[in-house]
Amino acid sequence: EQKKAKNRLASLEKKLVRLEEELQKIEEEKEEVNKKYLLAGEKNDVDKLMSLQEELDNLDNKILEKYQEYEETEIELKSL
């Protein structure tokens, strides 16, 4: 039972690290899309702006999901 708890603890800690890395990648991707968005805004490319806005919205949703997963993992980790 104790070994099970230790394994679970290690697994959750790894998951937190993985989630942090995933969040960082998504944030970097969002930064790139924001740059494209600004360029499209300068060119007044409405179609491109709409497409990029949709991409930004999707990235924001991914970020929220990852933060939620991170919080749930932290809570489980603290309960062990």
For the regions a language model picked out, list residue spans one by one.
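Charged, heptad-repeat coiled-coil alpha-helices that serve as long linker/dimerization "arms"
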Residues: E1-L80
